[in-house]
Design a protein with these regions (language model features):
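Catalytic-domain carbohydrate-binding cleft regions of carbohydrate-active enzymes
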Residues: 274-276, 324, 335-336, 341, ...
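Extended acidic/polar, glycine-enriched regions
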Residues: 252-335
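Boundary at the C-terminal end of the N-terminal hydrophobic targeting segment
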Residues: 27-31
Length: 703
């Protein structure tokens, strides 16, 4: 083979030629780069970051997109979309520069400043036409340009005008923006979602920090490129999972935009396409109860295969420490744990990575909590003595009774967190609109129990983040422990919580209603069954009132049931060890109300009190076979007259009613029962189920 020998002069000539060609190609590439104009206000400009030039969302977007794109930041602080607003964007220099930029892609995020009382009340009717005019301006300047219209970033409750107009006007603007996107045939990009569950990334309740701007940049990057990391599913989808039987099942996941998704299970085959935002969903036909299904999901590039899938009954088990209380800690653990080998019961145990013990958390813990990485899970596990021992005792006993009665697979998801208050489990939008006061300065907020606030401050003690997150913070556990389930189909919920709200019965009544509203909206089921354990007996003065409040809530709210636990309490320990009766009493409610089984769901539930002279006749639901739990006379009944002073009363069973009277009360006006923090009340029905603490007004019927 001939060898080519290059002389030094020839080498220099060739090298120079390569340099010239490379430079020309580089210039050509630069000329052909895709131009992205980021149009907006101070949020686009980068207010809230230390260095907007490098840390604003357009700057971070440039780094993500790389040299094939040229991103321009055309944000101006205080800019309004409204042309008659206090600072119209279309009258600012940035608007002209953005037009001259000749963008191939225009990303518009305007409307936050239009919530100003100088703007929205007077000029709201101009918003849609003004927005359409802005879009037309860019399309005229660059025909064929791609327009991305952005939903507004959050404005938090700490904003000075949040309740006086900003919250509601922002909601109206969001609706208008969706209308604009449809009318203009523009793409709608959600810039609320990446920040909404991360209020610490909005230090002034409005402007994102560098990390928050990074979340916006990644969202816009996905919208521009359609790349979302390929096919993914929520963590709750795993081998050995249980899917809800006999109901249409909607699967939800993520993939790159436009990806063709194919799903197969049990002879069914379905397909759909991922939307522009990377989300996809499809609905399976109802599955019959069974085992050993295989679920396959593919986008053509990656296939997810879930084996050992069962179809059966799925329940979410939630609340605070008495739901988190482990089977190995229960009074009957020695007998029950070795018997817990039940392959048709499957457990999804969402355990906190850091317990809320009386200690300061590490920097790693604080950072993870801020990122909503609070739970850990080993996936779905079949029920064995080992897996059951560390699972919720109440949930285990509930699931065991369901399985024994129904003879179908049972899936239990437990996300309970010790010490957690009800407000931590309600979604942010619900609290913002229905109870915003509880969101402000939560570690100093009297709506929140002093112990809860003190423990949170102790855990967060070493944090330098002024808005450090914590599991007890309002909304946190919904965002970290419910939302990640991505509406995984469940038959219902069992709940054991209230100890951390017993200081304020009235606030809890609001919160409990909002909790049910929140979860039922989330799962799209207005009648989602919700069965809860009443607080037990404990020497805390407010608990009789709280237990009675829980009783009244059950009678007011649809698709609810309450398991009375006052007979299995511990006078000195907020964590009574008798959990088997609690789980089984909750299961009775489910078996009766959800599955139509003919068994008494609960203990005697007072209906009314009628006076005849000194005597009061109390009637009850679930009253068949009224008796006492210990064979002793009825006790803890009290009667009050017009003065409101209660006196001990004698009580006897008459058929399916109880008759009470007190020699000190001539004209009874009210009766109460079990009205001691730690009560030894003993009224039960034929099923051995105890009556709830109650206080009831007396209706006079004559003498």
């Amino acid at each position: 083979m001939a060898t080519l020998i290059l002389l030094p002069e020839m080498k220099r000539t060739i090298l120079f030629s390569f340099i010239v060609i490379a430079a020309l190609l580089s210039g050509h590439a630069a000329a052909e780069s895709v131009r992205v104009a980021c149009v907006g206000n101070s949020i686009t400009y980068g207010v809230g970051t230390e260095n907007p030039v490098a840390e604003s969302y357009p700057a971070q977007l440039q780094a993500l997109l790389g040299p094939a794109y040229e991103v321009g930041n055309f944000g101006h602080s205080g800019a309004t979309l409204l042309r008659r607003g206090h600072r119209p964007y279309m009258s600012l220099p940035e608007f002209g520069r953005a037009l001259r930029f000749g963008a191939d892609i225009v990303v518009i995020h305007l409307g936050v400043n239009d919530t100003d009382p100088r703007d929205w009340p007077d000029f709201r009717d101009d918003f849609i036409p003004d927005y359409l005019a802005l879009i037309d301006s860019f399309r005229q300047a660059r025909p064929g340009c791609r327009v991305l219209v952005c939903r507004l970033t959050p404005i938090g409750p700490r904003h000075a005008r949040f309740e006086s107009g900003t919250r509601d006007w922002r909601d109206s603007i969001q609706q208008c923006i969706a209308t604009v996107a449809r009318a203009a045939q523009a793409e709608l990009v959600d810039l609320e979602a990446p920040l909404y569950a991360y209020p610490h990334l909005l230090p002034d309740a409005l402007h994102p920090s560098r990390e928050g701007a990074g979340r916006l940049a990644r969202t816009v990057y996905g919208a521009i490129t359609g790349r979302y990391g390929g096919l993914r599913m929520p963590a709750v989808y795993a081998d050995s999972m249980v899917l809800q039987r006999d109901s249409a099942i909607t699967l939800r996941g993520w993939a790159d935009a436009g990806a063709r998704i194919r799903v197969s299970i049990g002879g069914q085959r379905h397909h759909t396409q991922a939307a522009r935002n990377g989300c996809w969903q499809l609905t399976l036909r109802p599955l019959k109860a069974g085992r050993d299904y295989t679920l396959r999901i593919t986008d053509g590039q990656r296939t997810l295969t879930y084996r050992g899938v069962a179809a059966g009954e799925v329940w979410l088990c939630s609340g605070q420490s008495n739901m988190a209380f482990r089977l190995r800690q229960a009074a009957t653990a020695a007998a029950d744990v070795p018997q817990a080998r039940q392959p048709d019961i499957r457990l999804f145990n969402m355990q906190p990575r850091w317990e809320t013990t009386a200690a300061a958390w590490s920097a790693e813990a604080l950072d993870s909590v801020n990122a909503l990485r609070y739970y850990d899970s080993a996936g779905w596990q079949t029920c064995t003595p080992r897996s059951a021992a560390d699972f919720s005792a109440v949930a285990y006993y509930f699931g065991q009774m369901l399985h024994d009665s129904l003879q179908v697979p049972v899936g239990l998801i437990c996300n309970a967190v010790g010490g957690s208050p009800a407000e931590a489990w309600v979604d942010r939008r619900t609290l913002e609109h229905e109870f915003p006061a509880i969101l402000r300065l939560w570690t100093q907020n009297d709506f929140i129990q002093p112990w809860v606030r003190a423990r949170a401050r102790q855990n967060m003690g070493t944090s330098a983040q002024p808005l450090q997150r914590h599991p007890y913070e309002p909304c946190y556990l919904f965002e970290a422990g419910v939302a990640p389930l991505e509406r995984f189909p469940v038959r219902g919920v069992i709940w054991y919580q209230g100890e951390s709200n017993a200081h304020n019965m009235e606030a809890h009544e609001r919160l409990f209603r909002l909790l049910l509203q929140s979860w039922r909206q989330y799962w799209g089921n207005d009648s989602l069954p919700f069965f809860y354990a009443q607080l037990s007996s404990l020497n805390r003065p407010s608990w009789p009132w709280f237990r009675d409040s829980q009783r009244r809530l059950m009678t007011d709210l649809p698709a609810c049931g309450m398991a009375v636990t006052s007979d299995v309490g511990d006078s000195l320990d907020v964590h009574p060890r008798q959990k088997r009766p609690v789980g089984r009493r909750l299961a009775r409610w489910a078996l009766n109300r959800v599955y139509g089984r003919a068994l008494t769901p609960g203990g005697p539930l007072v209906k009314q009190a009628e006076a005849r002279g000194r005597k009061v006749r109390l009637s009850f639901d679930y009253a068949e076979g009224l008796t006492t739990s210990d064979g002793q006379p009825l006790r803890t009944f009290e009667v009050a007259g017009p003065d409101g002073v209660f006196y001990p009363a004698q009580a006897v069973v008459r058929h399916d009613a109880v008759v009470v009277e007190s020699p000190q009360v001539e004209s009874p006006c009210s009766v109460r029962y079990g009205w001691q923090p730690f009560t030894r009340a003993n009224l039960v029905n034929a099923a051995g189920l105890p009556a709830s603490t109650f206080r009831v007004a007396v209706r006079a019927t004559g003498r």
